[in-house]
Amino acid sequence: MKRRTLLAAGAGASAALALGSPAAAAARDTEALLRRWFRDTYRSIEAMTTGIGLTADKIDVTSADPVPSVNTSPTNIGCGLWSTVAAAGLGVIDTRTMHRGLARTVAAVERLERAHGFWFNWYDAHTGAVLTEWPGTGDPVRPFLSSVDNAWLVAGLLIAADADPVLRPRIERLLADADWSFFHTPYDADDPAANPGQLRGGFWTDDDTYTGHWYGALNTEPRMASYLGIADGSLPPEHYWHTFRTMLPEWEQEQRPEGEYVTVDGVRMWRGHYTYRGRRLVPSWGGSMFEALMVPLFVPEASWSPKAWGVNHRRHVRSQIEHGLVEEGYGYWGFSPANIPDGGYSEYGVDAIGMSVEGYTSKGVVTPHASFLAMPFARDEAIANLLRMARDFGAYEDGLGFRDSVDVRTGRVSDFMLALDQGMVAAALAQVLSPGLLQRPFRTGGFAARVRPLLAREDFGI
């Protein structure tokens, strides 16, 4: 494993953070380190991107020449798009190279089979064909439209359209049929259990049925789909108030919430919160970092809602830090769904700040992308945590970035890098190094006119 260059590059930043070097020198050292991390992370995304322009799900970095996986998803493709825009914005590639990469991906997306205006959940990253059998096992793959995965592809396409006016008309045509009301069940006060005013998880096209669940928890990554639909007018603004800050107090959940019933924009809702280590917050579903903090990489929730979302994001990060360093005593923190270091995929989180009774537990597995998501809210602590992971476990692959996860109890480091997680790393670094770089499409138009007023009225009661 190629570790030496990273550790040498990180030494100056680490010393600056730890020893209080003069401010200007510390800033230069830290920025150089973050730019190095971005550059290498972008190289990993390039390595995952196939000849037709689709970013595959993952790469195994144990070989000298990492090979992309067969499968990809709409989320992975979106990650490739916004990472390319970020690379140009940070000077890693020039504008011409950005255009070539975006154009290749947009052309591939134009050819992908769709249904009801949305993209299927699994494609062959090398051919663009819808997957009907899972690579390696041959298990059947049902054709499925995922609301949240489509949201991340649409986000990537909007970022690409904003960055490259030449591609904008083609992307607008692609998005013309993406009507989020397809996933929405309008609210019915006479039967809110069957008609909750929320988004379905998805739709099976082989038998024309929706999933049996809705995305009810507000502080989770599917709220990106909600914001997109409200912004483009395909979802009513009151849909936002029909999502849960916590479950209703009489429902079984991780802890009994405190709060009160309030009426906002004509919607009667439970304004609830949890308390963790003396800290009031609105929980996510499982207590993971990406549920809470992937969306604000793009939608400026903290600045549009400083007393609600802004406070909650910081408290979510602080809770993760204290869970890892104090409650469990791991010496490291950052818990979010990731590759299992020994193989496979699992959800990790801080159980106490998630609504689900089962929750996501930390199990001693930290994932670097969680620290990057925290970086806009706790920069120095996130950088120090990442440097410790690189130093103590060899978690950094020179030229490609951080491996996906580390079991800090055993020292086992994942052999893989995942497109989703590297895409979050790239977006987080873009936000830290060039604030707002990927947020332009989500600060204007319907986002400014319809989403921002909702967030301004948000009051979590914390």
Describe the function of each predicted region.
Residues T5-A23:
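N-terminal export signals
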Residues A27-I462:
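Ser/Thr/Asn(+Pro)-rich, low-complexity disordered segments
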